[in-house]
Design a protein with these regions (language model features):
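Conserved active-site alpha-helix within GNAT-family acetyltransferase domains
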Residues: 1, 127-151
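Short beta-strand-to-coil "C-cap" segments at the C-terminal boundary of structured domains/repeats
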Residues: 10-14, 148-154
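Conserved acetyl-CoA-binding loop-helix of GNAT-fold acetyltransferases
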Residues: 93, 99-112
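Conserved GNAT acetyl-CoA-binding A-motif
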Residues: 114-126
């Protein structure tokens, strides 16, 4: 059985500290970087069960946050849909770079960019086990009870 997912939201109200260098690119700028595109596909292919969802999500991506290691190789990505509110669809960090705060930096920089651009909310859906990461980045879970509809007793 798969782990339950939670929905999260963040209302950016101030700039947050970012612990690692993160590039925040438009999707058009990102696709011009062929090595980074190949690296993202490689990571998505190995870390997620289905590539179909990624392919379905990609046409709506407006921004990509990228972290590069000291050699310049992209080792962390975050994809953003951006109609009015922003939706984070993928946060991907290569196995050898995990545990270094890269995911936190990608999320924090995305929240900062949202704040600077006047975006009202940033939302995402993720596994429940990642709740500490997203809460540390200023996100609040929308608990299932909050979505429940209670009928009045007769």
């Amino acid at each position: 059985m798969s782990e339950p997912e939670l929905h999260y939201f963040c209302k950016p109200t101030a700039l947050r500290p970012v612990t690692h260098s993160v590039e925040f690119l438009s999707a058009q700028e990102f696709v011009a970087d062929e090595p980074a595109c190949k690296r993202l596909w490689e990571l998505v292919s190995t870390q997620f069960r289905t590539r179909g969802k990624f392919l379905a999500v990609w046409p709506g991506v407006r921004f990509v946050a990228v972290h590069r290691n000291t050699e310049g190789r992209a080792d962390g990505f975050l994809l953003v849909h951006a109609p009015i509110n922003w939706q984070i669809d993928y946060v991907v960090v290569c196995a050898e770079a995990r545990g270094q705060g890269i995911a936190s930096a990608l999320v924090a920089e995305t929240a900062n960019q949202a704040f600077l651009r006047g975006v009202p909310y940033v939302m995402l859906t993720s596994r429940q086990s990642l709740r500490p990461l997203y809460e540390a980045c200023g996100f609040t879970p929308v608990l299932p009870e909050a979505n429940a509809c209670t009928l009045p007793s007769e």
